[in-house]
Design a protein with these regions (language model features):
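Residues that define the loop-to-transmembrane-helix transition and helix capping
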Residues: 134-135, 178-181, 232
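Functionally important transmembrane alpha-helices
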Residues: 159-223
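Function-critical hydrophobic alpha-helical transmembrane segments in multi-pass membrane proteins
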Residues: 93-154, 165, 172
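Interfacial transmembrane-helix boundary/kink motif in multi-pass membrane proteins
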Residues: 1-4, 24-37, 50-83, 96-104, ...
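Residue-level signature of the transmembrane alpha-helical core
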Residues: 33, 71, 75, 105, ...
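Helix-loop interface residues and adjacent transmembrane-helix termini in multi-pass membrane transporters
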Residues: 52, 130-131, 153, 176-177, ...
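N-terminal, membrane-interfacial amphipathic/helix-forming hydrophobic leader that caps
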Residues: 1-55, 195-265
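Aromatic-anchored segments of alpha-helical transmembrane domains
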Residues: 6-11, 78-84, 141-150, 189-197
Length: 265
């Protein structure tokens, strides 16, 4: 059943903008929203059929609040990363002004929903149930990092950064809340702020029109700036996300959230 869920979500992961490159941007955003709803529906149906339960990790009552917190946290985290990079002279920043947000919003939303369902909802949750949280965190973080290994501009540093900063931190948010909503919010806001607000590469990809343009200082070391992969493969991103991840794990431990199941009752 886990394999079936994974394959279904992998199909839903294909960005609508790649399938409809010449479509109206607003239509593309709407199609991305539909893809997210389909992914959520597939996950819910297969969990219901395969595990004989309704997925508490997608409980609707806390969704709005946890999504809002996640969106705010993700935006603040990436803004902090760029403040460090720009302040240290590692990136230049040029404001462009108003730009359509449809493409960036669609990409951020779809990748966040589908990847969180697959990596935290399936891989982390089921490994946690089978082998405990330590193995689940290590394996899911490593797989998340390796999943970005073939992106444009990927390096060993980028794989390590994605595994540690996103794999651990997003998993910790799931562990703390027992839901997927906060990790979805952080994931979406991080990518949107990175690509649309600051105009930087997102995991080596182009998010389309942006409010500004951020360019790395070519003379700086790759591990400081992230190279073509983008700022998330930089040391400042690793430190910021690592700090949030450690604090979140500490809060989860204090809340006694490391039991046999990751999902809250």
């Amino acid at each position: 059943m886990a394999v079936l869920i994974g394959l279904s979500l992998r199909v839903a992961m294909v960005p609508v903008q790649q399938l409809l490159p010449k479509a109206d941007p607003v239509l593309g955003l709407a199609a991305s929203g539909v893809a997210c709803l389909i992914a959520l529906g597939i996950y819910t149906l297969l969990v219901r059929l395969g595990e004989d339960r309704w997925p508490g990790e997608l409980a609707l009552k806390p969704a709005a609040g946890q999504l809002a917190i996640g969106l705010g946290l993700g935006s603040a985290m990436f803004a902090a990363v760029m403040a460090i990079l720009i302040g240290a002279g590692l990136y230049s920043f040029e404001w462009h002004g108003a730009a359509p947000a449809w493409r960036g919003a669609g990409l951020a939303m779809q990748s966040a929903v589908v990847e969180e369902l697959l990596v935290r909802g399936v891989i982390l949750r089921l490994l946690w149930r089978a082998f405990g949280p330590a193995v689940a965190f290590a394996a899911s973080a490593a797989l998340f990092g390796l999943g970005h290994a073939f992106n444009p501009g990927a390096t060993v540093m980028s794989v390590v950064c994605i595994a540690l900063e996103a794999g651990i931190m997003l998993g910790a948010l799931y562990a703390l809340t027992g839901r997927l909503w906060m990790s979805i919010g952080v994931h979406a806001a991080w990518n949107f702020t990175q690509g649309y607000v600051f105009g930087a590469a997102v995991s080596g990809g182009d998010f389309g029109p942006s409010l500004a343009r951020s360019v790395a200082n070519g003379d700086a070391s790759l591990w400081l700036i992230g190279g073509e992969f983008g700022p998330e493969a930089s040391l400042p991103a690793l430190l910021v996300c690592g700090a949030v991840g450690v604090v979140t794990l500490w809060l989860a431990v204090r809340a006694r959230r490391f039991g046999k199941e990751a999902t809250a009752e």
